[in-house]
Each structure stands twice: as structure tokens, then as C-alpha cells.
A protein has these predicted regions:
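Fe-S-dependent hydro-lyases/dehydratases of central metabolism
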Residues: 1-375
Length: 375
């Protein structure tokens, strides 16, 4: 109770609070940062055995998902069967790592390894792993014998872990040591953050995408300075965004500078859970628990207290791009040509041309002839 009061007091004051302990419900790994963690677990088992202990007692205490998605290299492109060829090369290069991960899944409890070629960890997280609301494992019940229900939360070893914030799952990226501790059931320490509210109104205009909203967020939040803050979206405009649009906005959290960009649960969330194959019982549980906990998006509810509130009318968001080097340097698409010429002038780029031959045809290219989009 005393800890809860300190957290609430710090939040109301709009100040960073003292250090508190946080125990996430699960941990998400990708292969580049996750493999060293499971190597550590294996070494711990060896050390335990050397000391005369039972090595099988060394196990993750919370569900851990590791998705192999960072090893992909597109060696072959532009032809039929190129995906299969790239997969063969990937297994050839990473056979030892994949053998180890297969052993880890078979040897440790609470571990699920997703093989390569299944998708990106953050997309799989919101489609398959996240439950929004969780029930305690068998054998862990309340005083009356019923299961304990609690919110799904996570930490991940990738900076874009907040993608899950889009469907109402609190989570953020951490380092390998913190993820390892969380997997072993140890709480990680964090400071009580300032919570910034972003009140959304209006609806997106035709032709405006969630990425345009993300770039607007990046510009807006970087100007305010939200490093170390939690950002929570609320207001009538939330209902205008689908769950996948919200996930796209939350995915860009590292570019905003904040720790997470959290959306509440509503009917759009439930629609997404149904679309991705969650059971009717799970969807009903999410709805009931979110409403009971005041986590349901209700524009008519009494306003919450935030350290700061930022307003954004979605109808004012324009098709945009960013750059040339920073995601928060937003440029309205209508002004892209003008801004490009200005950048060329600022950098002293002349009107040089280059001749290239493509399929027997000769082309004269100038600066700006080729555009590459990172999505």
C-alpha cells in the first residue's frame, strides 16, 4: 500500500518518482540478443551441476518467446523461389545457433522458440503471443480457489517492443541483463515515470496512413521532450484508429524518445483479437477485466490526471515523410520537392547527372531520381 501511494503521489506531482520494482508477466527475445541469454542459462546449469545441485532447477520462471527474425539476409532476389533459396542459405550459415536454440526449447521450461521464416517478433507478439489479460497458471489461485487474473505485460530485448502497446499491452525494450533477470523471475527496477497524455480527436483524412500519424507523433513529442516518460493515448479519436494502426504508432516509440506509447482497450482491440484467432472466452475476459479496471476507452468518462496533456486532431495529420537523417524531421509530402531542393543547396550538391543502362535502355539520372522508403 505504501509503495502504491508513493507511485500515485509521484504521478500526480508530474515528477519522476523513486525506484520501484516491476515484474513483467513474460519476456520477448529476438535471436541476436536472445541467444546470449540462453547461453547464460546453459552456463548456470553447468555451474549448478559442478556445485552438486540439480541443473534442471535453472529455468525461466515466466513465459519466454524467442523469435528468429534477425538473421535473414536477402542474398537472392527478383526471381521465383528466392525465399526458399535465402532460407537454405540462412540455415547453412546459422546451423550451430539454431541447433542450440532447439536444444534450449527442449531443455528449459517456459520457453518457446519460433523458427526463421515465420515473421517479425513484434508482429508475432501482437498476433499470437499477447493475451492482453492473463490468468494465473494451474495451482496458483486466489483465497477462494479461483484463478488470479492480471494484465499481460512484458519486456523485450528489442527497442520496438512497445509495438504491443497498440493493443493495450504494457511493455518496453530492455537490455539483456534485465531481460535475463525478468525471465528468472526477478523484478527489474525502474523509476516511476512522468505520464504524458495525448488526447486524440477527429478522424484521419483519406490517404493518410498510420505512419503519417507516427511521424507527426515523432515531431510533436520530440519538441516536448518525453525521454523516460510513459505516453498514454486517450480521447474520442482513439476509436478512429484500428488496432493495427495503433500498433504502427506504438512501434515508433523509440523514435519519439519515450518508454512506451500505450493505447487503452476498446471494441477495436476486441475486433483484432477475434481476427487473429483468440477464443471467445479470452475476448470476453479481456473486455470484462478492462472495464472492471477502468482500462476501457470511454471518451465520456471523467478525465484522468496526467503530468501534461498534448492535443492532436487526427484530421490535421498530412501525408508525410521524414529526413534526410532524423525521423522527427517531418516534411509534408506536398513540400517534399521544395525541401529536397533546399537540402541539396544546403549541402552544396550540384546538378550532376549520371547515365545508366537498364535492359538496353539509356537513362539520365539526377539527384532525387531514386527514392528508397524504409517501412
Amino acid at each position: 500500500q505504501a509503495m502504491a501511494e508513493r507511485i500515485v503521489t509521484a504521478g500526480l506531482a508530474g515528477q519522476t518518482g523513486e525506484e520501484v520494482e516491476f515484474s513483467p508477466a513474460r519476456v520477448l527475445f529476438q535471436d541476436f540478443t536472445g541467444v546470449p541469454v540462453f547461453v547464460d542459462f546453459a552456463v548456470m546449469r553447468e555451474a549448478c551441476a559442478d556445485l552438486g545441485g540439480d541443473p534442471k532447477k535453472i529455468n525461466p520462471q515466466v513465459p519466454c518467446d524467442l523469435v528468429i527474425d534477425h538473421s535473414v539476409i536477402a542474398d537472392v532476389a527478383g526471381c521465383d523461389g528466392c525465399m526458399d533459396e535465402n532460407m537454405k542459405l540462412e540455415f547453412k550459415r546459422n546451423g550451430e545457433r539454431y541447433d542450440f536454440l532447439k536444444w534450449a526449447q527442449e531443455s528449459f521450461e517456459n520457453v518457446r522458440i519460433v523458427p526463421p521464416g515465420q515473421g517479425i517478433c513484434h508482429q508475432l507478439n501482437i498476433e499470437k503471443f499477447a493475451s492482453v489479460v492473463m490468468e494465473s497458471p494451474a495451482g496458483l489461485t486466489g483465497a477462494d480457489g479461483t484463478p488470479v487474473v492480471y494484465f499481460d505485460t512484458l519486456v523485450g530485448t528489442d527497442s520496438h517492443t512497445p509495438t504491443a502497446n497498440g493493443i493495450g499491452v504494457l511493455g518496453w525494450g530492455v537490455g539483456g541483463i534485465e531481460a535475463e533477470a525478468a525471465a528468472l523471475g526477478q523484478p527489474i527496477t525502474t523509476l516511476v515515470p512522468r505520464v504524458i497524455g495525448v488526447r486524440l480527436t477527429g478522424d484521419l483524412s483519406e490517404g493518410v496512413s498510420a505512419m503519417d500519424v507516427s511521424l507527426t507523433f515523432a515531431q510533436m513529442l520530440r519538441e516536448r521532450g518525453v525521454v523516460g516518460c510513459f505516453v498514454e493515448c486517450f480521447g474520442p479519436g482513439v476509436a478512429a484508429l484500428s488496432a493495427t494502426q495503433r500498433a504502427c504508432i506504438s512501434n515508433m516509440t523509440p523514435e519519439y524518445g519515450c518508454t512506451c506509447t500505450l493505447f487503452p482497450v476498446d471494441d477495436r482491440t476486441l475486433d483484432y483479437l477475434r481476427l487473429t484467432g483468440r477464443s471467445a472466452e479470452q475476448v470476453a475476459l479481456v473486455e470484462a477485466y478492462a472495464k472492471a479496471q477502468g482500462y476501457w476507452n470511454d471518451p465520456e468518462a471523467a478525465p484522468r490526471t496526467y503530468a501534461e496533456v498534448i492535443e492532436l486532431d487526427l484530421s490535421t495529420v498530412q501525408p508525410s515523410l521524414a529526413g534526410p537523417s532524423r525521423p522527427h524531421d517531418r516534411i509534408p509530402l506536398a513540400k517534399a520537392s521544395e525541401r529536397f531542393r533546399a537540402i541539396c543547396a544546403e549541402r552544396g550538391l550540384d546538378d550532376a547527372t549520371v547515365h545508366v543502362e537498364v535492359d538496353g535502355e539509356d537513362y539520365e539520372l539526377t539527384h532525387g531520381a531514386i527514392a528508397i522508403a524504409a517501412v
